[in-house]
């Protein structure tokens, strides 16, 4: 069935008109489409929001209309749906991605939130926010990446400056010696976390660190090693930092030019500099976005409200702007900018760590723009918070970049590597004043089945009720109970559906794995090519000789079926998944695989 419902962005709107069209009430598909057209005319929406409409709904309706030799008139004034672009598959950063077809409604906006990255991150509010900044129509923007939006903003800035827009990047990387390459070709700073569980932890985060470095250190393709400034003399330091306000930054550059202070801004470690006399192109692009995001964050009342959605999509714009400085095809990119930004980020984080240690704090972990601190002097809770506030002021003054208290955690657990025992850099979970912060474990992975996700959720909920070390036994019991339910056939089969991204066609696979089995079964059942998408299936019998018999696709599963439909090999497969997921939670507390087996 299809439901056409008016959903106003204004919370005060009382218009909740709904028009439902159920295909089961129609003798043939043609009458269903005709009824749907009547519904669209009756409700007459300006914006049509679908979930996977470009990949499922509109292709199906257009196929029905084509078979019946009629039009699909869902636009205004009885105009047909327009296929502006067919689906395409391409490689992006080593990952095969499918861009779905683009179905446009004449006179209306069709936004497919199921396939829109910006829509998923910021909803309609986020799409409107970026559309205003970039000048890209909302309907087009919903099918583009943040990179396309930042490119549009850069082009607009270039046109406002009266500067020709490069057709494509035409500048090669500067020649470097082997030693210079080793020193400069590095990313942000990572410090290995101290293993185990830590209590009373403060996490400090720099706000928009990389974009703020671009703005405050005047990093842009035309400002790196400029001819108007002098290289840094050995032993001389230049601590000039440009303000985030573009007008104030322009004024600072002009005053330095008038005073003939033409010493470049030294980049740490790599021996290069940026201009101090002319405010750069990239800083003028990112500074207004940083200011706008700061304003939106100040309006936030709760996580997930409209202001949070808007600031969240601006975060992705800023992240992309940094990434584009090192992207080989970016019109306004230059790898030396990327290297300088990373060098500054390492210096700023190390300086923050040094200031923290001077104030009696111990750094237990640091990642690029975040640092985790525990008290090293036995201070009271109030003394700790006072010290943290003072420390944040020092760091902000020293760096010229705002730093924020992300959260205060009652405890945080870093997950050790299964083989080496060394804690992983990006796998941890913590419980603080703002709730849970979880990174890297199965509950955060798209491929995880609902059964595993529920088990980990229950384990984490149990840990928050008391000191984790004292209730770890109850948490272990959740693992055994989940496995018991599986073996007794009490787990719904739909909760065991796992996902795999399809990166190759069936004939390109060299190993007969579960993804290949799912593709072969889909081909046997006449399903469409899933290249670049995800396939969803349940493992029922891994020992079967024919790959197509080892799994069942999600579309084949009866909602009433349970894990009793899985044979012993399938049960063992899911038990192994449960064991690994449980160890992600329990291993920081000293629980090993031997205890759970």
Predicted regions located by residue number:
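Conserved DEDDh/DEDDy metal-dependent 3′-5′ exonuclease domain
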Residues: 18-124
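Short acidic-aromatic active-site loops that bind/stabilize oxyanions
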Residues: 22-29, 279-286, 304-311, 338-346
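Alpha-helical packing segments of well-folded alpha/beta enzyme cores
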Residues: 32-39, 289, 345-348, 352
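DNA-dependent DNA polymerase catalytic subunits
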Residues: 136-227, 231-246, 255-263, 270, ...
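Active-site cores of enzymes that catalyze phosphoryl transfer or operate on phosphate-rich substrates
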Residues: 1-14, 112, 256-330
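Extended catalytic-interface subdomain
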Residues: 97-162
